[in-house]
Amino acid sequence: MMILTDKDRRTLTLRWRHFSVFSVLEWHRLLALRTTIFVVEQQCPYQEVDEKDPLCWHLELLHNQQLIGTLRVVPPGVAYAECSVGRVAIDSNYRGLGLGRELMDAALGFCEPRWPQGVRLSAQAYLQAFYESLGFQTVQGPYLEDDIPHIEMLKRFG
């Protein structure tokens, strides 16, 4: 696990981009990180890339310009009536540092002014307490998604 000093934290950058502005190399790096986590680490032999990505806003977390985390925001009407957050991924060397919370805080700040009806997500069940700490409530589940236990959660704004 990496230890981030205050100086290191100042070199962290959050960057929002729509799929349409990624270069091929940048998109490849993002997919490589997601695939490492969701396919290799979790031993989940299912399709990582889907038809939603081209419609999404993607948040990148960079440390010294190296991609170490990402998530995507899916607009309302694509997966759910509300917008949704998914594919939250942190490089294994940077876990346990609160960076997942930083990504989620940024995502909620991005979503609330654009889609004030709230945010829905399909969370891996073991992360329920984490998402509850961000104000999400379980609305369905547990159920299997790609053979991994998940729960559907919702956060209303206001």
Predicted regions and their residues:
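Short amphipathic alpha-helix that is part of the acyltransferase structural core
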Residues: 2-67
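N-terminal, polar/charged subdomain of small-to-medium soluble alpha/beta proteins
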Residues: 4-10, 70, 87, 91, ...
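A short beta-turn/loop motif at secondary-structure boundaries
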Residues: 49-54, 77, 144-145
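Conserved beta-strand in the GNAT
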Residues: 60, 66-76, 81-89
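A conserved beta-turn-beta hairpin within the catalytic core of GNAT-like acetyltransferases
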Residues: 75-85, 95, 115-117, 146-150
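Conserved acetyl-CoA-binding loop-helix of GNAT-fold acetyltransferases
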Residues: 90, 96-109
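Conserved GNAT acetyl-CoA-binding A-motif
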Residues: 104, 111-124
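Conserved catalytic-core motifs of GNAT/GCN5-like acyltransferases
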Residues: 122, 132, 137-152
